[in-house]
């Protein structure tokens, strides 16, 4: 037996459980518990002693039941099984361009995942590709660009525009990435609305006030300005809200 294997099996099961849970916001799946060396009887004993706390069917909190939002989203993803990812509003919240509002956590799977349950809404998507998946705060999630398409039907055009621009400001999504998602959207109901926003150009705004001024200028026929772009001037660096570079 090689050293790495010997070290793994010499480690007590509870230490292995703690190590796995530490990477998953304190949450762990039953199959992971078994891989750590616990059978069903051992799991039941730890539940009875308060070492494990049921979060969802087949998912446990390790040590204590307290849950941050990240832990709740991680638990929902684990409940979806292998390949499940946070999506829609949950993904947008992880990426930082939408505020969480205590709705059910959206999880997308390619297949399986079971029925939606208390606190979780499962979605199935055959079109979800590897390039649409990332990790945010250690949680498997759809990319920001994909999340924008997913939440678009739930938002007014004004709120969708704000989300797109905020995602750019957070450097979560670039217009090129959003355009790529749109090309592969296969007739998604919100494709046209999202495409109309992306077509106006790069606009990484940080506030609703910046949005308002930018929209007023564009509606008045002004050329699209550079928005919050770096400007080096006289040895200093500035980030003007809106700037029209000199031409000619």
Q: Predicted segment positions?
A:
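Short gly/ser-rich loop at a beta-strand->alpha-helix junction or flexible surface loop bordering the NTP-binding
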Residues: 1-192, 208, 226
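Conserved short-loop catalytic and cofactor-binding motifs
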Residues: 21, 201, 230
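Active-site metal-binding core of divalent-cation-utilizing nuclease and nuclease-like domains
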Residues: 113-117, 130, 222-247
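A short, surface-exposed helix-loop junction/capping segment
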Residues: 190-201
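Acidic-basic catalytic patches of nuclease active cores, encompassing PD-(D/E)XK
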Residues: 200-225
